Amino acid sequence: MAERPLDVIHRSLDKDVLVLLKRGGEFRGKLIGYDIHLNVVLAGADYIQDGEVVKSYGKIVVRGDNVLAISPVDIE
């Protein structure tokens, strides 16, 4: 059976993810929540633009309308 997108996101709970935004920039942080609209809650999130951290947040909700992609981040 094919893997569903929300299954991938669910397996990423409590792990670091990269959230790419439609208008450029990205958030990187620990995924602590999400819903079917791809609204995501990140803890310890950094907003990154052009490879540089612009601002750090303790906890932030990113509205699903702004999300282009969500990717698990493997930290070794």
Curated annotation (Swiss-Prot):
Source organism per UniProt: Thermococcus gammatolerans (strain DSM 15229 / JCM 11827 / EJ3)
Keyword Ribonucleoprotein: yes
The UniProt record lists the keyword Ribonucleoprotein: yes
Homology family: Belongs to the snRNP Sm proteins family.
Name this protein carries in UniProt: Putative snRNP Sm-like protein
GO MF term set: RNA binding
Keywords associated with the record: Ribonucleoprotein
Disulfide bonds: none
A GO CC term assigned to this protein in UniProt: ribonucleoprotein complex
InterPro entries reported in the protein's UniProt record: LSM_dom_sf (IPR010920), Sm (IPR047575), Sm_dom_euk/arc (IPR001163), snRNP_Sm-like_arc (IPR022901)
Domain Sm: 4-76
Entries under CDD domains matching the protein: archaeal_Sm1
